[in-house]
Amino acid sequence: MIKLSKKYCLGISFVLYILLSVCEGHKNLTCDFNDVYKLEFHPNQQTSVTKLCNVTPNVLEKVTIKCGSDKLNYNLYPPTCFEEVYASRNMMHLKKIKEFVIGSSMFMRRSLTPNKINEVSFRIPPNMMPEKPIYCFCENKKTITINGSNGNPSSKKDIINRGIVEIIIPSLNEKVKGCDFTTSESTIFSKGYSINEISNKSSNNQQDIVCTVKAHANDLIGFKCPSNYSVEPHDCFVSAFNLSGKNENLENKLKLTNIIMDHYNNTFYSRLPSLISDNWKFFCVCSKDNEKKLVFTVEASISSSNTKLASRYNTYQDYISNSSFLTLSSYCAFITFIITSFLSFIL
């Protein structure tokens, strides 16, 4: 039996951990200009350099940009990236993303230096319009001295190492199976309700407004409440009310994926699992004091046949994003590191 040295085992664990971590970062739809698409200047660099990070996420996946740190003085453009985006690679046509891609939600920011955002991310919204790209930029700027023909400094100029983030927003073939309680004609959800119109027509009717959707394996589901309403339960899609009105943890019954709980915009999304073993009904509520409750009910149905289920499942397998690999590689990296580190101490 070959006996491995501690240094050798630790070396293996370190290399595997780094390789899998790099793979993870790529699969996680992250444009990392600090460590992957580096924007550092090379010695004697005289011209600007551009690097492109192109990502093609699926709906509801998270895209992240890392631009600068406490040691890297990079600038993100626009500074409000993901709230605002550019519509072209030449940093023109600045758009508010909620107007450019209707249904956008879940922006997250992280600042490692004062008054500067270094990391941003957002979830890819359901999009019924044709596929479209959006852009943000990360820049590292430097002023250099240009020597004249005699070798003496003659002028100064700025050079820029620029990272371009190109995100292709995919297009859905059908609307999200869900309820929009803010408009009678929803651009995202399959059903729409205008609360003002309903209230005017039925001012004396105190019955709650119930919107029911029938969904199957892998279907996108969701709802949107008016801005002055609250959502019950607060963590809808993690938990929900059953038909008895009891709040239940859905993970014990129906493991939903790609959950987005955007309380700022009162918009919630999720996806049904690829396998549903039994019919299941649950609901969440938009509520406001002294107003009718707006009830979003989901009837999740077991597939009618194994053939149909297999067909839907295989179709979905092609659609599954690289984030599944991310989770696997994360565990592999961690477990590999632990095992090889342990071996280094016992061998």
Swiss-Prot record:
GO CC annotation, single: side of membrane
Domain called 6-Cys: residue spans: 27-172, 175-305
Gene3D superfamilies xref list: 2.60.40.2860
Lipid-substituted positions (GPI-anchor amidated asparagine): N322
Main location: other
Annotated membrane topology: Lipid-anchor; GPI-anchor
Position of the signal peptide: 1-23
Positions of the propeptide removed during maturation: 323-347
Location in the cell: Cell surface; Cell membrane
Disulfide bridge positions per record: C31-C53, C67-C138, C81-C136, C179-C211, C225-C286, C236-C284
Keywords, sorted A to Z: Cell membrane, Disulfide bond, Glycoprotein, GPI-anchor, Lipoprotein, Malaria, Membrane, Repeat, Signal
Glycosylated residue positions: N28, N147, N200, N228, N242, N265, N322
Subunit annotation: Heterodimer; heterodimerizes with PF41. May form an antiparallel heterodimer with PF41.
Protein name listed in UniProt: Merozoite surface protein P12
Gene of this entry: PF12
